[in-house]
Amino acid sequence: MWTSESDALTATTGIYYRLRQAFAQSKANPFFWGELRVGPAMWGKGTGRSLCDNDMLDVMLNTLSASDASTDWSYLYTTIDQCNQVLKYAPGIGMSEDNMNYCLGNARFIRAYCYFWIARVWGDAPVITTPTEGTGEAIYPSRHPVAEVYARIEDDLNAAAG
């Protein structure tokens, strides 16, 4: 499947496409997952938006339900899967050390970034370190304690810096 340095570099660039998708969802972004949940927020005058927007109120009051757009972590896990593909397949390709470090470092850093947001918003969560290559129950792993999620983040950041 991956046969050239170009394949690995293209897949690494694809990580950022996936990451942009994760944060381009209507209300699933750092503002909604972060600042809006911890303090007063108001839309500026002239935006045509109201603080009474139901999803915003759910976020602010911490009364989210599964139907709220801001509760969907699937785009973050799609990004993690792209990172896992790079981490699995790039080392099997002959390429320059600089490009290998670029690919693996980016994959580790972005995977850590995604897990940071998952841990911050949801706490306990599945920790997946291999690409999804099948179907069935294997693609629905159980949640790990949030401490294990943070340990994965730390490992990835150390490896990315290394």
List where the protein language model places each region.
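Short glycine/proline- and charge-enriched loop/turn segments
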Residues: 131-138
